[in-house]
């Protein structure tokens, strides 16, 4: 209990206020919306993205944003929902994406003292200097190597990332050119990253 009490104030110090701008929309196609403490409604190119914003896209929509803290580029594709957070203390920066559904890609710079975390219903991924694709598929979704259960898919285009399955507690390092499927059953399935995975991460024309 003492440890919990000590950590709680620290987390408050590290979290940016919800009024803090953490990004800017560099491109928006179709119906893209957000709900947040500062603004809610449709997102347009050039608008600010704030700490804690929940962003959603319609079927054929797309949004790309620049994280002004760590200069990472984050893209969200059709039928997707995420929540974006940023925190900072002294020289360290942390970016956190919660994926509730759909597909996200990110291109990260190799920056010291920066942590990038992706949370999904079945997994937590820690990323450093990596270009990757991430998606959460429900039981009603279909796609490559579909297992018939809710799962999360991570594809590494360059660099590497570490994924922990929250059901089993198992951790796996995913190298460049590999794709891992992490299931709610606690399993990891490894594949080569091919077009059958990347075809779902394209900007609509």
Feature names for model-found ranges:
Residues 18-54, 58-60, 66-205:
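Flexible, surface-exposed loop/linker segments and immediately adjacent secondary-structure boundaries
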Residues 4-13:
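Sec-dependent N-terminal signal peptides
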């Amino acid at each position: 209990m003492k440890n919990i009490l000590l950590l709680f104030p620290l987390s408050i110090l590290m979290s940016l206020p919800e009024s803090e701008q953490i990004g800017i929309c560099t491109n928006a196609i179709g119906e893209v919306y957000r709900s947040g403490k500062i603004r809610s409604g449709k997102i347009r190119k050039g608008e600010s993205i704030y700490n804690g914003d929940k962003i959603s896209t319609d079927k054929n929509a797309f949004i790309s944003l620049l994280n002004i803290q760590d200069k990472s580029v984050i893209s969200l594709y059709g039928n997707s929902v995420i929540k974006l957070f940023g925190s900072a203390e002294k020289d360290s920066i942390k970016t956190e994406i919660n994926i509730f559904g759909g597909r996200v890609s990110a291109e990260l710079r190799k920056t010291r003292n920066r942590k990038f975390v992706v949370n999904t219903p079945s997994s937590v991924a820690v990323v450093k200097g990596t270009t990757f694709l991430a998606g959460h598929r429900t039981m009603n979704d279909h796609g490559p190597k579909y297992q018939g259960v809710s799962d999360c898919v991570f594809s590494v285009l360059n660099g590497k990332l570490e994924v922990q399955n929250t059901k089993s507690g198992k951790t796996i390092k995913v190298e460049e050119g590999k794709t891992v499927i992490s299931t709610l059953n606690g399993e990891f399935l490894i594949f080569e990253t091919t077009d059958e995975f990347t075809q779902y991460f394209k900007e609509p024309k």
